[in-house]
Amino acid sequence: MNDYYFPFGQKLTKVQQTETTPNKEVFVLGVYASAVHAKWLDNDNRVLVQALAVASEPEIFWTGEGVEQIIAAISIPPELGRLVPANKNLNGPSGKALDDLFLQPLGYSMARAWLCDLLPESRVNPNQKKAVKYYNERITSTNYHLPVATIPDFDVHELEKNAARRKDEIVAELEASGASTIVLLGDLPIRWFLHFFDKRTKLSDFGNSQETYGQRHTISIHGKDYTVIPLCHPRNAARLGAHSSTWAEWHETWIKEKGKK
């Protein structure tokens, strides 16, 4: 992986499962890692950027712990103001949603889950592009000796380009986990991982109704049968930003009626 940098100089790092003892109960596959977000204030406490991605998450599906210390460790020239944690709902929302709205209803804990993403690094989503552009314009117009922010945009073609290689890496993690149950978060893990082993390519292919949502399916991967539970992306389940109200409603009902083991 090339070296990429966040605003104010933190290097992009891979975010992968670190607690790798086997015999996990469930393997969870998402899309790409999130980031630590800061609010950027000028020296008069005026907000320059409400939420600026400034570092890789400290752990996969991070839930926001220690955000103050992470941001305090990022140095910023005094003339450029200061960084403070972004609004509470902007650090660790996917991790919190995964724990509260996916794992707990299924009877699992984070400690007994092996977590994985199709892309094990942060990417810039459309909402961040404007913030990154503003940072780059500010630091290139003056002599602050800060690196230009270069975190790549999220591009589904990157998933396609690396799909075969990542498939093998994900299978290796799956086998190392010892889990026999797989939870897939949204369309992209189905299209760019599961489709190597199954004809379906998106969540609605498993059923497009409340009755079919969240059902368990037996799928063979490299000669071993796994219980696969395809669910919506945490963004939808937790109604984070732009989301599908239909999937959100189906997920809420699934929690109430089908989520328990």
Residue locations for each model-derived region?
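Short, active-site-adjacent cap segments at secondary-structure transitions
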Residues: 35-36, 122, 189-192
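Active-site and ligand/interface coordination hotspots across diverse enzymes
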Residues: 1-106, 169-177, 217-224, 250-261
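Proline-aspartate-enriched helix->loop->beta-strand connector
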Residues: 170-190
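Hydrophobic/aromatic beta-strand patches that form the interior of the parallel beta-sheet core
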Residues: 27-29, 114-116, 181-183, 227-229
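C-terminal capping/extension of enzyme domains
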Residues: 1-10, 49-60, 128-171, 190-261
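Short, well-ordered beta-to-alpha junction loops that form the rim of enzyme active sites
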Residues: 31-33, 118, 184-189
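Short, flexible loop/turn elements at secondary-structure junctions
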Residues: 30-33, 120-122, 232-235
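Short, surface-exposed acidic-centric catalytic microdomains
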Residues: 61-63, 67-68, 92-151
